[in-house]
Amino acid sequence: MGKKVAIIGAGISGLASIRSCLEEGLEPTCFEMSDDIGGLWKFSDHAEEGRASIYQSVFTNSSKEMMCFPDFPFPDDFPNFMHNSKLQEYITTFAREKNLLKYIQFKTLVSSIKKHPDFSVTGQWYVSTERNGKKETAVFDAVMICSGHHVYPNLPKDSFPGLKHFKGKSFHSREYKEPGIFKGKRVLVIGLGNSGCDIATELSHTAEQVVISSRSGSWVMSRVWDDGYPWDMLYVTRFQTFLKNNLPTAISDWWYVKQMNAKFKHENYSLMPLNGTLRKEPVFNDDLPARILCGTVSIKPNVKEFTETSAIFEDGTVFEAIDSVIFATGYGYAYPFLDDSIIKSENNKVTLFKGIFPPQLEKPTMAVIGLVQSLGAAIPTTDLQARWAAQVIKGTCTLPPVKDMMNDIHEKMGTKLKWFGKSETIQTDYINYMDELASFIGVKLNIPWLFLTDPRLALEVFFGPCSPYQFRLVGPGKWPGARQAILTQWDRSLKPMKTRAVGHLQKPALFSPWLKLLAIAVLLIAAVLVF
């Protein structure tokens, strides 16, 4: 009999965790408070307490070849960026194909998780649940928390003087579902993140006027990148990471700002971030620049104070006759079923080794899956996190001593503050992070060796998209179809757009031949030195 593992939540993190437990011979039981899988991506026409909530028009920001489970590509005919309903269809198909649904207890609320009295010896947990008014408590050998970080809204109303006197409506963006009720209205959106920009641009087609208030600005990227290819298939590459890690900071920063300004000059649109060299996650929105050009959306600084009908901004300008204020101000991280001392979260800092393991526990039998954010997609990240966590729970992998884990956390926090700023402490660099996790479970690629043994594949792996298939190409959990999936990823990306015969599919020339030759030479020298 394998160890019994409680999994909290049946979104993408929960499904990845169930599958990883099964791969390691563990016995998972997943508790899901709703009646379906999907978590964040399961749309509901009203916001539900304790659950993530999305608006009806949400599309993915990662393209299909970059966001799939590593051994389960999206169907060829699925669009590159898909509506939430399409992604939910994929998630459901994955769960059924992998036979995961039978391990899920739906409509079950986890009310508390507490250490067993002999935790220091066994590492076991008491998990208490409620279903249809019935309460139960069971003992589990480990717990994987997969409840996400889009559940508990950050609603800083106390930070806005005069808001309590405002006579219009004010609410968090999680309550927003569709634009119909805002026709002809004047709307202020506070926050320049993905949700704020999506909502503002959608409302701009029906509302009288929309204003976005932002404290610090943001880079705004289009899903459509150079020559019309999906942004992440060109931007999230090992070659880009190689350059970022090895170029002098001044050159790297200059190149980053140049890339961000490639489509339009952010200064001209009042969008320029205060610290443009920080690698904070940019906003993904294809419509915002056009809506600003058309005058239906405008960008303003932080709100200084509210009156009964207006907002006064820090630059002294006023937005008058406001009907609604929507706070797109993000979410906090909370685990109400868990003692606060286990996972400390203050000032946006979560104390977790590699964003997964509470370092102070006597036994490494608790893991948080899916909390980390990066420019990479969530699904492959959670898949790799869950694989490592399952092996740690099983005992195949071990964690470093507490002192070493704490030192690593503090060191990484310093790096995160440098690269992403104080407000982005769960952010991380995608490829570096994924390679680090991959090394723990023996699935990290040896790129120089790959150039010597399979140069065709190596070129695609290094210069092409860092797609999820790379993390099931070798080692434990290897997928036999990974190599072919990598070599055909551009075909699947281009196929749904090939709806009229106009010639052959045009794959991108990823980098100039001279740059390729230089990089290959460096890698081959490294391979010779190593072997």
Swiss-Prot record:
It is a single-pass membrane protein. NADP(+) binds at residues 60-61, 195-198. Its main location: membrane. Liver. Disulfide bonds: none annotated. FAD binds at residues 9-13, 32, 40-41, 61-62. One of its GO terms (cellular component) is endoplasmic reticulum membrane. GO terms for biological process: taurine biosynthetic process. It is found in: Microsome membrane; Endoplasmic reticulum membrane. It catalyses: trimethylamine + NADPH + O2 = trimethylamine N-oxide + NADP(+) + H2O; N,N-dimethylaniline + NADPH + O2 + H(+) = N,N-dimethylaniline N-oxide + NADP(+) + H2O; hypotaurine + NADPH + O2 + H(+) = taurine + NADP(+) + H2O; (S)-nicotine + NADPH + O2 = trans-(S)-nicotine N(1')-oxide + NADP(+) + H2O. The chain crosses the membrane at residues 511-531. Pfam families: FMO-like (PF00743). GO terms for molecular function: albendazole monooxygenase activity; flavin adenine dinucleotide binding; hypotaurine monooxygenase activity; N,N-dimethylaniline monooxygenase activity; NADP binding; trimethylamine monooxygenase activity. Its cofactor is FAD. Belongs to the FMO family. This is Flavin-containing monooxygenase 3.
